[in-house]
Amino acid sequence: MTKRVLVLVIAAIAVSVLIPPTRAQQAPRRQPGAVYDFDFPGKASGPAPRRSLSGVWEFAKGGAEGIQADGAKAMPSDGKPEHELPFTPEGRVAFMAHKPTYGITQVPSALTNDPLPGCDPQGFPRIVLHNARTEQIIQLPNQVVILYQFNKKWRVIWTDGRELTKDPEQPGWKTKDGPPLEPRWWGYSVGTWADDYTFVAESFGFDDRTWLDNAGRPHSDALRVVETYHLVDADHLEKTITIDDPKFYTKPWVALDKLPYRLQSASFDIPEQECVPSETAKYNSLFANPAAGVDDTGK
């Protein structure tokens, strides 16, 4: 690469740090080896299996469907009145303290206090509300395990009948035995079948240092998340996520609304996608900090 081309590339990247981001996180239209609904125009699917979530699931309409740069897909931070979240006064204060790089309160990346660029755990539900990619669901007799492409993370949803507490001061399971449990980045999750084709999971006991999405939406230790997985047919399921946090929001709100996934081949190999602290530090030093007029100490 010539020096002139290199300078132009660096300048373009630096400018992109300051302008409102459009789709910097765009995923490719398809994952290598994946299939999508547009690959089978007009082809009908068979009946849905009963009580079976197992398989590799990719977004039915294309690989970029899970990229939610401006916030949760069903409620983006775009300034539209219908997408204004029902903050409590405490919740709004928490929201305004966050400095995201996307949404209506965005700042240059060098000035963000988003914990994710430093590779802190994104936790749940942010794993599916900001940069969702391919998922593999493994259904066991007493658990549903979900493997996520991003950072190679996983969650366990227990289906053995245990119950969640309702007290943020005592997160975890309702039990008199064992040591006291602590808040978790991924919460504590239980699930059950509402009918033969609908699985409902509930999660509680979250570490409140995580954000809900890229737009800096906050949550408290009282957050409760409800996931609904509906088997539509042999090839599709729909995912809905509802946020219920009475400390920060006056009423529950839907973050994902029947987002469609398509079943992939059992031989589908999920690509690797990692957050690398050294790469983030290098990017900040070379581009983000100079573009925002700060040095490597952030001042």
Each PLM stretch: what is its role?
Residues 2, 20-299:
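PEST-like low-complexity, intrinsically disordered acidic/proline/serine-rich tracts
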Residues 8-17:
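Bacterial N-terminal signal peptides
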Residues 2-3, 12:
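Active-site bordering "gate/hinge" segments
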